[in-house]
Amino acid sequence: MIFNCGILFRKELKDFPCELGLLLVGDSDMRKINRLRRGKDKTTDVLSFPLEFDSAPLQNVLQKRTGFDSNSLPPIALGEIVISVDTLEKQAVEIGHSVKDEFYRLLVHGFLHLLGYDHERGEEEERIMKLKEDECLEILQEL
């Protein structure tokens, strides 16, 4: 599963090497992280914490690397994705699909946040992110 996500992520990053952290936690730890990092005292399914792209969108970072051998540059540090396994399992049952499919959905959702997509910035941004999420999930199903 992780390998397939790596293939998708490299495709989205135009084969530039990247690194990201993935933390799988329970609802209790997710609630603590959400409270500390976002001021929300509740659990959630997935959180993303970007590193390099807080001030520079991904496209700007990639443009600066254009023309260079991607293997000669250090990997792009995307950030961290935190997934609550407890919530993942509950949502898989509620939605009616496999734990694997829900894991893919949450990982892709978190990854897109690391790339600068944000469904919380309005309806148009939400629509764009949903389209990209569906596109990525379709690619994963084909791998």
Swiss-Prot record:
The keyword Cell division does not apply. The keyword Transcription does not apply. One of its GO terms (biological process) is rRNA processing. GO terms for molecular function: metalloendopeptidase activity; RNA endonuclease activity; zinc ion binding. One of its GO terms (cellular component) is cytoplasm. Disulfide bonds: none annotated. Its cofactor is Zn(2+). Its EC number is 3.1.-.-. Binds 1 zinc ion. Belongs to the endoribonuclease YbeY family. This is Endoribonuclease YbeY.
